[in-house]
């Protein structure tokens, strides 16, 4: 691994600690030794919508969380992180392809931080209106459904949880835990 990539992975890892173990998100590093993490598994606790089939009909229903994998390729940060929904069914949203791949509302820039990219992705899951891509959506059916129902204040945004960051003390504690062998790094005891 090139030094430049290692430096960037480490910088992103430390930034990601600012959103570790929040009410809306926990994550674990699943590929690469921290802080040189190349793949994250995110457990998201935000209310959203999914499309399901029952008795020959498709219906949109609420979901209360999902699991997402974030992969950083060897050519990262020149190529955007790949974000893939592992939960079935995936989120039903204009910025998410029906197979569960995230399509950001704005192009990736190598100067962008992974943390900010993940926060924008979380904003789409909770239907933040400023992040809905209507010009070139990944999922046209989801866009049609959203435009038909967006006036329903009870539905949108689908979750009013603020996407806040950890305090400096919480971030420092998360860093100590993440870099200490055998210690817990999230609330479920997963290392």
What is each of the regions a protein language model found here?
Residues 1-65, 75-191:
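UBC/E2-like fold recognition across ubiquitin and ubiquitin-like conjugation systems
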